A protein has these predicted regions:
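Hydrophobic alpha-helical transmembrane segments of multi-pass membrane proteins
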Residues: 25-35, 100-111, 162-172
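N-terminal topogenic module of multi-pass integral membrane proteins
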Residues: 1-43
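Membrane-interfacial loop-to-transmembrane alpha-helix junctions, especially the N-terminal start
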Residues: 1-6, 51-62, 135-139
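C-terminal halves and exits of single transmembrane alpha-helices
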Residues: 65-113
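Extracellular/periplasmic helix-loop-helix junctions in multi-pass membrane proteins
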Residues: 86-90, 151-172
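Alpha-helical membrane segments in multi-pass integral membrane proteins
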Residues: 107-115, 132-153, 168-175
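Membrane-helix boundary/juxtamembrane motif in polytopic membrane proteins
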Residues: 117-148, 187-206
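Internal transmembrane alpha-helix with an interfacial aromatic "cap," most often the third helix
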Residues: 33-66, 71-79, 112-126, 184
């Protein structure tokens, strides 16, 4: 249906990087956002029939894919500078390119999350899952605060503790989306499948979590 691919995409959006030049804040993303956007594009393909909002969210993955490609290319060239001194001379230019693309991506991501949540809310309401409907409202608020904060940081010099709060909020937002997408998979997708024999402890744990969530509903 697509929720599994969206879940995988959000794990790629988490910050897993290595430093190239810490003095200017240049790094390389080990799990590139480009892969996350590809997973979003593919995952939303399966969700298109259920809401126009999923269609709009999928449209937004196209410019995000372009942005992710530029960022990955710039980071890859910068990484070569660790071994090629001639490239290292242009690290600040590459960092400017990366920061510019990141700033442009912020409003795109804000609208992407809004359309994604609206689509999930519409689908959850249709299958009568009020808890997931409520989770989409929380997700919209969290992502709005986070991305508006990112825009503010890009325009106005702010104290260091604000940056630290945004880093913390990054993990809160993405883990909340992972939790919400897991709920969608278990209650919307997995609930429609035929029961299968449990072959391993992981599947057994998922079954128990599903039963607990069902009891809470």
């Amino acid at each position: 249906m697509g929720f599994g691919l969206l879940f995988a995409g959000y794990t790629m959006l988490l910050v897993w990087g290595m430093a190239i030049d810490p003095s200017i804040g240049l790094g390389f993303d080990i799990l590139p956002d480009l892969v996350a956007y590809l997973l979003f594009w593919k995952g939303l393909h399966g969700l298109r029939p259920y809401s126009k909002n999923f269609v709009y969210a999928r449209y937004l993955t196209i410019p995000l894919l372009a942005a992710g490609g530029i960022t990955f290319a710039a980071q890859s060239v910068a990484l070569l500078g660790k071994f090629v001194p001639a490239i290292a001379k242009h690290w600040e230019l590459l960092l400017t390119v990366i920061n510019t693309v990141d700033t442009i991506s912020v409003p795109l991501l804000l609208f992407f999350h809004a359309y994604l949540c609206l689509g999930i809310r519409e689908l959850a309401a249709e299958v009568e899952l009020p808890k997931i409907v409520s989770r989409t409202k929380v997700a919209i608020v969290l992502s709005s605060v986070y991305y508006f904060g990112q825009l503010l940081v890009g325009m106005v010099p702010l104290p260091g503790f604000i940056h630290m709060m945004l880093v913390l909020l990054t993990f809160i937002v993405y883990f909340y989306y992972l939790y919400m997408l897991y709920s969608c998979y278990m209650h919307i997708v997995y609930a429609d499948e035929e029961p299968k024999e449990v072959f391993n402890p992981l599947m057994s744990l998922l079954e128990k979590m599903k039963k607990k969530d069902s009891d809470d509903e």
